[in-house]
Amino acid sequence: MFVQTFILVSINHMSNTKDIAIVNGARTPMGRYCGKLRDFTAMELGAVAAKEAMQRSGVEPAEIDHCIIGNAQQTSGDSIYGARHVALKAGVPMATPALTVNRLCGSGMQSVVTAAQMIQLGESTIALAGGME
């Protein structure tokens, strides 16, 4: 089990084109089956990684305007809307939209692609994206 998150931002606010950058990221250590991380849910680990990614990038939780988290193995009771749980546990305001993506092995990558598309379309300026299993 591990979790990784990234902060994506639009770096051309005043132009018609939007260049997008991953400004920072964080991940948890890789865990073994029934290892030391067994008592933590993916959502708890996701929140730890999300908080660290925001801290490293200097982004406040209130600045996040979309949270997109990929999760293929929704095995715990709180994983049905995992992105919302991660966002709230990381301090992102309740009014911020959250989207959980399931694209099996590519869920985390799809969350980054979706966040970039939202920024490109002007639906977001700063997004929190990542994957958790």
Residue map of PLM features:
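Conserved beta-strand-centric core segments of catalytic alpha/beta enzyme folds
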Residues: 11-49, 107, 111-133
